[in-house]
Curated annotation (Swiss-Prot):
Gene3D superfamilies linked: Galactose-binding lectin, RlpA-like domain
The keyword Glycoprotein belongs to this UniProt entry's keyword annotation: yes
Signal peptide: 1-25
Disulfide topology: 34-75, 78-139
Protein name: Expansin-like protein 9
Coiled-coil ranges from the UniProt annotation: none
Gene: expl9
Domain Expansin-like EG45 residue range list: 31-144
CDD domains, A to Z: DPBB_EXP_N-like
């Protein structure tokens, strides 16, 4: 049978569509830049789909802190989490609302299973990762989006969608930002109200009742738009939509560099400044007699704050600052400390981990002095868990210490420590904190506190819009959504603003990205050759 040229073009387009779907569906394509959050493990998994009421996915699940969960707005979204031991991808299926970690509004808190936690950390050694790196990614599910309808029972005992109906989705690769409907006889699309993991429509006073056929329009968090035309559907049955969000990567438009790999979050600039910053503990210190974390022995020194640490260290005793879940040392250049010691000593050591050999140059005496320790002399591992000051002599000393501060390398990102929503753009930063050394905020036991320079806190930059536009999150412009099915997207806007945090080295992911680019170019080359043969 002879195939005409039009059929050749249809075959080529079909091949392109299939290959792009296979490439992108199997990858976790980046949908945001990197942020920092916190993670904790749990033995109890969400049952019955959690608050999102989603079917159990093929990947791990997560419950988000109350403000991050945002009333279910992040149901079904997937995130790649980075800890000291590796990475894992989880899908949001639930929220949590009890306990400080769940109710604070300053940072994302991921509650994940012990199994998933142990892919990135060690649940038998610590129960938090305070410097968690995270990034929204496509879920990598195969197949199409599934849709399920529900309505009210009519007088005949059958489901009636005329005045009220619900709709829920599953197996979507990109989070759903909003859903709109246009029924027969309606003059314009109507936005459905989100109800945790589902969406609800009610006939408005004086409005038209829902008549079929109708069209649903789904807008993804990346601005993509899918339309679904349907006649009256059966209730409570999962229906294959025959469509899927396609992550935009390769030759398709993507505002996120797929070769940039997120690492763990940076530590706060200060370990101690009047108080311990968020995530640091001193309970692993040893052989001491007096330990005061808020001593007033400042000697009216103008370079000190209101409080200092005072510690009577016995012979071979140590002050240990420990951070659960570890911290990366990649961007640490030096450590600065204000310190005085009585009696004077030449035997105070500083090291990462359990032991070390670096001796702080002395003598350290009864006058306050600032010391600077190059991180390189401490022989750091890629990820460390503690920093200690050790009295390596046979007699006791009294040590006062304050303003324990990291100095970051020029390559360190000049952004705030906490990015609670990496898909939006934050307010402009004060000029005083643009440098790497000053661009990290201090934290208290709950979350963010402002540093001396001041940092604008960003909890959620998305707007609760009713017109189909995306959250500006500080003024960045929105972009017109792109329909997957090829229809015009003139009346639908998808906000997808973001900003950079930091990168880490990951050659395997870079190779995977390079492979996808290479495959895309090979595909184009094949198409060009076919066209040359045809013409």
């Amino acid at each position: 049978m002879k195939i005409n040229k039009n059929n050749y073009f249809k075959i080529i387009i079909f091949i392109i569509y299939v290959i792009i779907n296979l490439i992108n569906a199997s990858d976790n394509v980046k949908l945001s830049n990197c942020g920092q959050a916190r993670a904790e493990p749990t033995f109890k998994q969400s049952e019955n789909g959690g608050q999102c009421q989603l079917p159990p996915p093929s990947i791990g699940t997560a419950a988000l802190s109350l403000s991050a969960f945002n009333g279910g707005a992040r149901c079904g979204q997937c995130y790649e989490l980075t800890g000291p031991l590796g990475k894992t991808v989880v899908m949001v299926t639930d929220g949590c609302n009890s306990g400080e970690a769940c109710t604070q509004k300053d940072l994302f808190n991921f509650i994940i299973s012990n199994k998933d936690f142990d892919k990135i950390g060690n649940s038998s050694s610590y129960v938090n990762i305070y410097s968690l790196g995270y990034q929204e990614v496509s879920c990598g599910f195969l197949g199409n989006i599934k849709i399920k309808f529900g309505g009210s029972l009519g007088h005949n005992g059958k489901v009636d969608y005329s005045y009220y109906f619900t709709v829920s989705f599953s197996n979507f690769n990109i989070g759903i930002k909003q859903v709109q409907i246009l029924g027969t006889g309606m003059v314009s699309y109507m936005k459905l109200k989100r109800s945790l993991g589902g969406f609800t429509w009610n006939q408005e006073s004086g409005g038209s009742k829902l008549q079929f056929p109708a069209t649903l329009v789904l807008t993804g968090v990346d601005g993509q738009i899918i339309s679904y035309k349907f006649r009256q559907p059966p209730a409570n049955i999962a229906i294959d939509m025959k469509k899927q969000f396609i992550p935009q990567v390769g030759l398709l438009s993507s505002k996120f560099n797929q070769s940039e790999i997120c690492g763990m979050g940076n530590v706060p600039e200060y370990i101690y400044e009047d108080s311990l910053t968020f995530g640091w503990i001193v309970s692993n210190s040893w052989r001491f007699n007096v330990f005061n974390l808020s001593s007033q022995d400042t000697d009216d020194n103008p370079t000190l704050g209101e409080s200092v640490i005072k510690m009577d260290l016995a012979a071979n005793g140590g002050l240990a600052f420990t951070r659960e879940g570890g911290f990366q040392t990649k961007y640490l250049e030096s450590l600065k400390v204000m310190i005085k010691v009585l009696p004077p000593t030449n035997s105070l050591q500083c090291f990462f981990g359990a032991s070390g050999i670096y001796v702080i140059p002395g003598p350290l005496g009864g006058d306050w002095q600032e010391i600077s320790i190059p991180i390189s002399v401490l022989k750091p591992q890629k990820v460390e868990y503690s920093l200690s000051f050790y009295n390596n002599q046979g007699q006791s000393i009294t040590m006062w210490i304050d303003n324990i501060k990291w100095i970051f390398s020029p390559e360190a990102p000049p952004t705030p420590l906490i990015i609670t929503d990496p898909t939006v753009t934050p307010p402009p930063l004060p000029q005083s904190i643009v440098t790497a050394a000053a661009g990290v905020v201090g934290l208290n036991s709950i979350g963010i506190t402002s540093n001396k320079g001041g940092v604008a806190n960003l909890v959620d930059g998305s707007s609760n819009d009713d017109d189909g536009t995306g959250g500006t999150g500080g003024g960045a412009s929105n972009k017109v959504g792109k329909r997957v099915d090829g229809e015009d997207g003139d009346n639908f806007m998808g906000g997808n603003n973001a900003f950079s945090y930091y990168n880490d080295d990951n050659s395997s992911n870079i190779l995977l990205f390079s492979f996808n680019i290479t495959l895309t170019f090979l595909l184009l080359s094949l198409i060009i050759n076919i066209l040359l043969l045809l013409f």
